[in-house]
Structure formats: structure tokens, C-alpha cells
């Protein structure tokens, strides 16, 4: 207690008073002392932060630490998930990645154990052991110095007071002297020990810095091992990724998609084309009418994942067409490539048609192989779609307008308006002729089901769908679909099949019963007399349900040539003629029909041909007359008793319609008129009635109106792209058609030219390449004797007209026709199907044809069923009157 009291007293004197304070450390040792505090603080914080970096539990062995790592938990989760997705790409990826994460966790645990042992623990020893020991010695030295100063101060005080009281102080002074010497020795010992420890610490500073070098080396080694694990795992995962073909197709370069999937045609293109071939070829406004956004998004997602379950999209062809447009537009590079953009635009401005086709052919050959194959596939489909433009209204021009901007665009696009203004015109000028001449650009046949992955489903037996002869989907089966014409057509066939009467709904898509009557001419004019020695060529009568199908097969391949006539409206009518379905008569086979027309001879047929009678419309039949507008829709009345002999002028025995099989022209230009060759048989006297005219009779007669006839036409036949030459049968005689052959040879010529120097086809008739355009103007003024009649119709007899009372409606002005010398009185009278014959002494003639055979009179007694069927039709059409 006395020593402690002396220390406090001495410390107070040194702090407050003026007592001398002894400093035993040198300047170097004082500097080392100040650094110790800084080093201790640094080591303490470094240790604390390193421990925080550990992901495992601090202070445990490597195995236990590995189990506690977050990476280990992640690896276990991935491996467990991979067992639930064994056969999928995701399952394989999870399994491989889980193994890699487990290896990384093992490397990490070993790394942390090493860092903890080699770095963290030594830093902890520096901060918490070595430096504190030195600091303790420094404090001990400070206490010894205080003791030494206190003893020395007391000794000095005793030595001063010894002069006044010398006898009693010698013993006390000696004691203080000894105590002071002892304290000084202790100070020196402590000072030496402290200095040694400080110098040792400074000597070890290089070793302490090596800890951090070891830390970085340990981290580098850990990362190298981890990188080795990753480099070993990544190729395996990439292999799984490359082997898995189900990757998005939209927005992927065409070459990459084809290489990855191993396909020749891009999946979205082939899938959409196959779907449209099944259900979309008769959809009006295909590629032009937008689809629902949700439906389109769903279809694109289904195509992206390469799913084969696309049955639900059969009912919405507009969504399929929208997906095809979207795929073409989302390609990083257009199908017609950026590199050829300048060449395409330059070719578009060429005025000469032949040179333009040659340049287009050369540019097509420059396309990359993958682009060329897919472009050819798409163009072939679009050409097939354009063949049914009479139904879907998608002519080559319309298709080019809608799809062109999705096939070619500039590399650096501006705004949408600028792109549309700069590109659309050029693209349309390029795409339209390629579609029109698709068979010349790509003469080889294209199998649309390239991958053989699309199998058409069987049609239910209740869906009696039917096709016209040249329909684009005649080789596929119709599917039931809402808002589609296929179901409506099938229903109409079922409803009217009992009367052996088919209605071609394609001629007027939105026409009901009233419209169907309005689009047909009200009256059928009698025909000029013909020789009675000829027979109507006909075949066996088909069953009611298959009448359209047989007529399709019979007239589907009739070649359309330059001699085909396309009748326009008469001067007095404001509406174009509308085609109407045939009755039970089927169009004969093309070989027989064409050979008879081309040869100009009459081919006798069997007596069963008398059952092939049907009512037809004149070749230049005009639109509906005012009388038809007064008709009302009524149910068919039962057939009344028939009179024994109908009027001689009744044209009930006419054969199939001679109307052009082309649909009404959609072009703003009026169709041209082409005169027919004069008839070959005009020797029958006017007073002799035609034998076939006795086979049918109207239900009632009027004193001023002629019996109403319901004209019937064969189904409209869209022209084919590649027209074969017309071949005559061996028994047919006469030269081939002089007008059709040049046109056809002009189309066949390019197929024999060398590929590098193509010769463009002589410009074919517009009606051949585009059904919506009128016939070429050059045929309008051609020689009437060489003009070819319609190649897809049956010749029909000409009954003798019967004088009728004069009605109140005057006939319209008629263009002059070509007649024989014996019919010079009829040159100013034009045929009409919607006007009433006004002169009781005159006969209304029809545009003359090369062959107008007439049936034998003995066949009249064999066609009672045909008369009944035709009477039912007449009764239906004349109910309002």
C-alpha cells in the first residue's frame, strides 16, 4: 500500500506539479511503440472481415464445413429436381449443373480451411497475443519508472534535510539509497526486455505481410480448381443444349434454325402452309384480315416450342396466316436477303416484261441455298393460293401487296411510313410477276409436306364438303371450322341434294336464297336451229352427293388459253353475270370435251347421254333483269301435272352451260368481248321443234312472259399455272386449236432453255396467270372463225323458238354478231338471258360456237326423270310469278 501510495503521489506531482518525469525509452523505441497500436488495429479488422467471408462454419473441419456450405445446398436441390425431369433438357441441365456445384462446394470448403489455418489464425495471434504482450511490458516499465522516480525524490528530500538534523538521518538516507538503486535496476531490466520485443516485432513485419500474399495465392488456387471444374462441365452442358432441337424459331436466323433442326424448310413456314392448305385456301381475305392477338401469340408460342398439337388452329386460318407473316417479318435478315436488296429494287423498275422476268430469274439464282429453297416453297404455295382468287379474293397483286414487305426490306429502315413508301412499290413489282410465273421460275414440283410430319386428318362422314375442279386444296380434306365456307358449302350440298341441285356458294359468298335467285338471269332465250343429226356428248349420270366431285375431276384440268372467252356486262346491264351451280349434269372429262371442241366434229354418244341434260346460260349472258328483282323467297312448290307437249321454243334441253368458267372479273377494266366462230349446223327448219326441248316444261305460263329458266353453270375453274398442251383423242379429227397452241407453246418454251440464259415466257394471257384480270385486248378483234369457244363447257342443242306476245319492255341495243348467210335477218339481234323476246317473227340467236350438236328425237322418251328434276328447279325459280 505504501508503494502504491508513493506511485500515485509521484504521478500527481508529475502531472500537476513540477516534478521531473524520467523517460527511459529512446526515440526509435517510442516510434515502434506508436506503430504497434496501428498494426494491432489493422490485424484485428482484417481478421474480422476474413472470417465474415467464410461461407462455412468457422472453426470446423473440412467435411462438416462442406455440408454447411450454401453451394452444397444448391447442388442437392438441383440434383433432386433433375430426378423429376429425367427425359427433358432441363432435367439434364439440372443434373450436370448440380454435380458441378457440388464440386465447387468441395473446393470452396478446402479453400476456407486453408485460409483459416494459414492466414486468419496468424493475424489473430498478432492482433490479440503478440502486440498486447509488448504493450503490457510497456505499462510495466511505466510503473517501474514511477517507483524509481518516487524513491529518488524521497532520497533527495532526505539528503537536503540532513544538514539541519544530521544525527538522526544517516540510517534513513542509506535505506532510500538502496531502494533507489533497486528501482533503477528494475527499470533497466524492463526497458531492455521491452526494447528486445519491439525490435523483434519490427523484424517480423515482413512475415506478417506474407500472410496476405498467401491469401491471394490460396484464392488463385481455389479459382483455378473451380475453373477446371467449370471447363469440364460446360462442354457437356453445351452438348446437351445443342442436341436439343426445341428452340424458338421466331427471331432466329434462318440458317441457324435449319441447321439446328435439321430441316430443309423452316418449321413455321411449313406448318403454316400445311395448315392453310387444309383449311385456308377458300378463306376470303387470307393474309389480309388480321387475327386475334391472343390467338396469334398462342400459335407463335406453339411453333416456337415445336409442338405438333396444332389441331385447334385449323378453325382459324387467319391466325395461321398472321403467324406466317410474323415469322417472315421477325427474321433478322429478310428471306430475299439484304445483299440483293439493290438488285431487287433495280429489277422492279424495268419496264420491258421479258427483260424483267430474265433479271428476276437471275436474281433468284443468287439467293443463298437455304433462302432459295424456302423462297421457292413459299412462292409455290402463294401461286397455288392465287389459283382460287375467285373465292379468296387474293390475286397475285393482293398477295404481293400484303406479303411483299415481309419478304424484303432495307437494311437501315426509317419510320414505318418511309419504309412503306420506299419499299412496298418495289416489292410488289418484284413479287407479283414471280407469283404469276411461279412455274417458270421454279419448274420443278414442290412437295409441301417436306418433313412428312403433317398428316391430314380424316373428315367426319357428316361433313360433305366438295371442291371445284382446280381448287387448291382438292388433294386434302376439308376440316370443319367455324366461320368457314367449308361447313356452309357442305350444308348446302346436303340440303339441296334431294333435288339433284347443287349451289356453288363460292360464286357469291354471302348470298342466301333471295340473292341466289337475283344473281341468275330471269329468262333463257331460245337458240337458233341446228342440225338434228348430232348428239349431245355426255356421260353416265353421277349420284347426287358426288355430282360436284365428279364435275371437279372432269373440269379441273381444262387448260385455259388465249381463246377462252370471258363475257362482260351487256351495254344495258349494270351488273356482271353471276355463275350458278349445275344441276345433276357433270362436266365431261377434259380429254373428251377438249377433243370434240378442237376438232369441230360431232362424236356420237350412247343413249344414256340423254340423262345429262341441264339448263345453261348463254355465253354472253347479262346480269339480272328487272323481273328477277320482284321474286320472293318461297319454299319449293310441288310439281304440278305436266302438259303433254311444252312450247316448241322452250329451251329445256340445253346442255351444260357455255358460260366461261372464269369467275367474274375483279379488275376495274371491263372484260373484252371475243366473237365465237359461226355454227356448223344451221339446216333445221324453224318450224321443227328440237327433240330435247320436249323433256321439260314450266309449271305455268303467262300470256306475255316466257317461261323462267334457272341457268346453271359448271363450278368456276381457276386457271392453272402450268398449262399443258391440248391433246385430242385418237378418234377425233380436225386440226388443233389455232389460237390456244401459240399461247401454250409460249408458256412451255422457257422450260427448255439453259438455266443461265433463261428466255422469259411470252407474256401469257392475264386470265391465265391472274383469274381476276380480263382477257388480253389483242383477242377482242381477232378472226371470229379462228376464235376458240370455251374449253370447259358442253355443246347443247338449239331448239326452235316459239312466237311470243310482245312485252312492254323493249330489248336493249345489241352488238352485231357473226351469222351464216341464211341468218342475215338476225344480225342486229344480240342474245340475252335477261330480256324478253319481243318480236313474234324473230329468233334470238346466241354467240355462235364451233360445235352445236343436237340430240336425236328418239331420246326424248327416255329422259322422263331428267324432265322431272328440271321441272322442280323451274318451279322453284318461278314461284313469285
Curated annotation (Swiss-Prot):
Signal peptide: none
Gene3D superfamilies per the UniProt record, alphabetical: Arfaptin homology (AH) domain/BAR domain (1.20.1270.60), Rho GTPase activation protein (1.10.555.10)
Record-marked site positions (Arginine finger): 288
Keyword Ion transport tagged: no
Superkingdom in the source lineage: Eukaryota
Outcome recorded upon mutating residue 288 to A: Loss of function; leading to defects in tight junction maintenance
Entry GO terms, CC: bicellular tight junction; cytosol; plasma membrane
Membrane topology, as annotated: Peripheral membrane protein
Subunit structure: Component of a complex whose core is composed of ARHGAP17, AMOT, PALS1, PATJ and PARD3/PAR3. Interacts with NHERF1, FNBP1, TRIP10, CAPZA (CAPZA1, CAPZA2 or CAPZA3), CAPZB, CD2AP and SH3KBP1/CIN85.
UniProt domain comment: The BAR domain mediates the interaction with the coiled coil domain of AMOT, leading to its recruitment to tight junctions.
Protein name in UniProt: Rho GTPase-activating protein 17
Organism: Homo sapiens
Amino acid at each position: 500500500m505504501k508503494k502504491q501510495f508513493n506511485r500515485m503521489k509521484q504521478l500527481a506531482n508529475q502531472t500537476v506539479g513540477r516534478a521531473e518525469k524520467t523517460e527511459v525509452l529512446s526515440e526509435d523505441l517510442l516510434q515502434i511503440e506508436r506503430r504497434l497500436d496501428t498494426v494491432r488495429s489493422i490485424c484485428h479488422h482484417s481478421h474480422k472481415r476474413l472470417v465474415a467471408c467464410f461461407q462455412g462454419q468457422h472453426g470446423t473441419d473440412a467435411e462438416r464445413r462442406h455440408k454447411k456450405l450454401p453451394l452444397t445446398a444448391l447442388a442437392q436441390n438441383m440434383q433432386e429436381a433433375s430426378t423429376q425431369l429425367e427425359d427433358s433438357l432441363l432435367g439434364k441441365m439440372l443434373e450436370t449443373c448440380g454435380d458441378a456445384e457440388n464440386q465447387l462446394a468441395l473446393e470452396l470448403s478446402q479453400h476456407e480451411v486453408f485460409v483459416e489455418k494459414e492466414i486468419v489464425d496468424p493475424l489473430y495471434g498478432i492482433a490479440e497475443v503478440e502486440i498486447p504482450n509488448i504493450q503490457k511490458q510497456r505499462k510495466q516499465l511505466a510503473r517501474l519508472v514511477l517507483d524509481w522516480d518516487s524513491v529518488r525524490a524521497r532520497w533527495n528530500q532526505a539528503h537536503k534535510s540532513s544538514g539541519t538534523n544530521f544525527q538522526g538521518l544517516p540510517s534513513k538516507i542509506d535505506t532510500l539509497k538502496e531502494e533507489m538503486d533497486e528501482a533503477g535496476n528494475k527499470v533497466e531490466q524492463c526497458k531492455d526486455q521491452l526494447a528486445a520485443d519491439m525490435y523483434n516485432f519490427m523484424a517480423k513485419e515482413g512475415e506478417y505481410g506474407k500472410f496476405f500474399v498467401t491469401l491471394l495465392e490460396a484464392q488463385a488456387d481455389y479459382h483455378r480448381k473451380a475453373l477446371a471444374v467449370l471447363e469440364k462441365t460446360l462442354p457437356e452442358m453445351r452438348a446437351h443444349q445443342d442436341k436439343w432441337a426445341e428452340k424458338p424459331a421466331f427471331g432466329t436466323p434462318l440458317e441457324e434454325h435449319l441447321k439446328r433442326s435439321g430441316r430443309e424448310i423452316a418449321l413455321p413456314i411449313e406448318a403454316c402452309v400445311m395448315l392453310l392448305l387444309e383449311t385456308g385456301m377458300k378463306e376470303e381475305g387470307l393474309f389480309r384480315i388480321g387475327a386475334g392477338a391472343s390467338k396469334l401469340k398462342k400459335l407463335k408460342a406453339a411453333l416456337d416450342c415445336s409442338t405438333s398439337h396444332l389441331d385447334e388452329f385449323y378453325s382459324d386460318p387467319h391466325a395461321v396466316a398472321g403467324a406466317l407473316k410474323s415469322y417472315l417479318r421477325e427474321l433478322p435478315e429478310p428471306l430475299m436477303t439484304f445483299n440483293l436488296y439493290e438488285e431487287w429494287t433495280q429489277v422492279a423498275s424495268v419496264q420491258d416484261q421479258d427483260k424483267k422476268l430474265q433479271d428476276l430469274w437471275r436474281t433468284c439464282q443468287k439467293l443463298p441455298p437455304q433462302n432459295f429453297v424456302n423462297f421457292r416453297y413459299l412462292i409455290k404455295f402463294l401461286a397455288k393460293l392465287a389459283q382460287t382468287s375467285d373465292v379468296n379474293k387474293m390475286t397475285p397483286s393482293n398477295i404481293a401487296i400484303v406479303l411483299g414487305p415481309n419478304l424484303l426490306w432495307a437494311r437501315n429502315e426509317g419510320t414505318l411510313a418511309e419504309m412503306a413508301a420506299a419499299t412496298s412499290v418495289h416489292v410488289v413489282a418484284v413479287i407479283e410477276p414471280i407469283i404469276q410465273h411461279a412455274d417458270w421460275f421454279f419448274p420443278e414440283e414442290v412437295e409441301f409436306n417436306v418433313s412428312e410430319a403433317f398428316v391430314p386428318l380424316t373428315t367426319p362422314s357428316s361433313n360433305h364438303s366438295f371442291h371445284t375442279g382446280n381448287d387448291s386444296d382438292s388433294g386434302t380434306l376439308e376440316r370443319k371450322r367455324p366461320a368457314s365456307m367449308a361447313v356452309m358449302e357442305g350444308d348446302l350440298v346436303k340440303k339441296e341434294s334431294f333435288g339433284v341441285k347443287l349451289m356453288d356458294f363460292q360464286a357469291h359468298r354471302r348470298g342466301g336464297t333471295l340473292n341466289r335467285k337475283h344473281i341468275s338471269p330471269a329468262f333463257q332465250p331460245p337458240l337458233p336451229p341446228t342440225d338434228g343429226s348430232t348428239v349431245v356428248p355426255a356421260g353416265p349420270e353421277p349420284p347426287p352427293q358426288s355430282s360436284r366431285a365428279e364435275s371437279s375431276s372432269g373440269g379441273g384440268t381444262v387448260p385455259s388459253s388465249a381463246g377462252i372467252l370471258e363475257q362482260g356486262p351487256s351495254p344495258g346491264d349494270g351488273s356482271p353475270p353471276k355463275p350458278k351451280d349445275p344441276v345433276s349434269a357433270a362436266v365431261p372429262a377434259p380429254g373428251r370435251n377438249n377433243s370434240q371442241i378442237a376438232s369441230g366434229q360431232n362424236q356420237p354418244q350412247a343413249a344414256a347421254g340423254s340423262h345429262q341434260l341441264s339448263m345453261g346460260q348463254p355465253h354472253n349472258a347479262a346480269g339480272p333483269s328487272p323481273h328477277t328483282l320482284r321474286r320472293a323467297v318461297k319454299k319449293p312448290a310441288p310439281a304440278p301435272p305436266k302438259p303433254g307437249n311444252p312450247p316448241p321454243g322452250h329451251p329445256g334441253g340445253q346442255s351444260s352451260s357455255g358460260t366461261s368458267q372464269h369467275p367474274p372479273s375483279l379488275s376495274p377494266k371491263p372484260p373484252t368481248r371475243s366473237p365465237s366462230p359461226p355454227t356448223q349446223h344451221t339446216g333445221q327448219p324453224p318450224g321443227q321443234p328440237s327433240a330435247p326441248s320436249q323433256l321439260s316444261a314450266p309449271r305455268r305460263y303467262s300470256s306475255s312472259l316466257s317461261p323462267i329458266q334457272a341457268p346453271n353453270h359448271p363450278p368456276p375453274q381457276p386457271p392453272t399455272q402450268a398449262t399443258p398442251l391440248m391433246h385430242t383423242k385418237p378418234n377425233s379429227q380436225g386440226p388443233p386449236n389455232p389460237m390456244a397452241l401459240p399461247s401454250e407453246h409460249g408458256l412451255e418454251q422457257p422450260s427448255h432453255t439453259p438455266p443461265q440464259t433463261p428466255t422469259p415466257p411470252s407474256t401469257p394471257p392475264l386470265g391465265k396467270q391472274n383469274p381476276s384480270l380480263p382477257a388480253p385486248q389483242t383477242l377482242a378483234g381477232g378472226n371470229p372463225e379462228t376464235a376458240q369457244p370455251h374449253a370447259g363447257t358442253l355443246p347443247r342443242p338449239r331448239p326452235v323458238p316459239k312466237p311470243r306476245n310482245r312485252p312492254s319492255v323493249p330489248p336493249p341495243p345489241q352488238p352485231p354478231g357473226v351469222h351464216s348467210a341464211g341468218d342475215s335477218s338476225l344480225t342486229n339481234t344480240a342474245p340475252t338471258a335477261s330480256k324478253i323476246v319481243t318480236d313474234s317473227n324473230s329468233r334470238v340467236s346466241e354467240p355462235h360456237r364451233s360445235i352445236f350438236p343436237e340430240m336425236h328425237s328418239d331420246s326424248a322418251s327416255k329422259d322422263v326423270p331428267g324432265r322431272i328434276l328440271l321441272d322442280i328447279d323451274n318451279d322453284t325459280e318461278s314461284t313469285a310469278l
